[in-house]
Amino acid sequence: GLSKTADLANPDGPVHFYPGVAYPASKTAVNTVTVQYAKAFPGIKINAVDPGYTATDLNGGTGTQTAEQGAQIIVKMAQAGPDGPTGGYFDVNGPVAW
């Protein structure tokens, strides 16, 4: 996706030619803030999630999944227990490298 440096840098990837700067930069900033907050508040589980391209009013319903499907990773990470991850970036398939 647009938050993954590897995807933006890969000339064979689907987002390599995305012309914008602000959106992918903001996603990278969110990941950095997530890591820094997780270090600053070790007693709290702080993670970022990618719900995927979800059909909403914001995108005119063009997303490839329902809001309920997009919410799955959000709910999962909100329910992470004391031994759960912190400072990471996750989608429904698990940790996402950025």
Residues covered by each model-derived region:
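C-terminal helical subdomain
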Residues: 28-32, 39-40, 44, 48-51, ...
